[in-house]
């Protein structure tokens, strides 16, 4: 492990925190320390995954809050604690040597109850956002294995609901995940395979566009346009979009907010060309 040679690396301390995490004596503090230091040690994921009892301890932390989800009684401190556990899972999901093991163990399924919550309180919002971060870490590297596995789960409907009802930050991570599915050929084919799947995605994107008319959330708009552009690569979806693409993307509604983003303007122009809206592009 190359980081053992780093002058800032404290292997004895890291292993002591792991012992505390597994033994349960000072688990909460161990979660805080490990999650705080996780970006300093690029091999921490390997230590976490291969250390006896660590994954069991992290899953215990996650499962322990299930009874607090419905009715929604999750408190801030409890949310912070489980989010520290989720941050360590994200560390494991991000590492190239542990990602596939993480996936094969179906750890992501333990996070879906968190994504399925509806409460808009800060503890729940933080829980959803951190859970999305774990999924985002998995899809970030465009791995076909990750896409294929997640397509067999309910992650897309969960992300769509968050895209419609979540905070701006949660919406941004959720649409990033959906965009990753769309950018994969298998993912695009899956979403466009039935009208119901396409309509579920398109209707949420349409609703987001109408919300963006008022909020002008730039990061979200970039993702929305890229999702539409990728959908237009599918012949059936392209034909449907000719009839249902929201008007604010056809006219100059977002011209001001996009004026300095040449890449996103090019994406929007290409989308309109794909849908044969040449007249609008040339205005």
From Swiss-Prot:
* Any GO MF annotation of the entry: RNA binding
Fetch the Pfam families from UniProt: Rcd1
Any single biological process term in GO: nuclear-transcribed mRNA poly(A) tail shortening
Q: Which InterPro entries match?
A: ARM-like, ARM-type_fold, CNOT9
On the tree of life, the source organism's domain of life is: Eukaryota
* Keywords recorded for this protein, A-Z: Differentiation
Q: Does the keyword Transmembrane helix apply?
A: no
In terms of Gene3D superfamilies, this protein maps to: Leucine-rich Repeat Variant (1.25.10.10)
**Disulphide bridges, residue numbers:** none
One GO cellular component term, please give it: Mei2 nuclear dot complex
Functional note: A differentiation-controlling factor that is essential for the onset of sexual development. Induces ste11 when sexual development is invoked through nitrogen starvation.
Which family is this sequence assigned to?
Belongs to the CNOT9 family.
The entry's protein name is Cell differentiation protein rcd1
Q: Which organism is it from?
A: Schizosaccharomyces pombe (strain 972 / ATCC 24843)
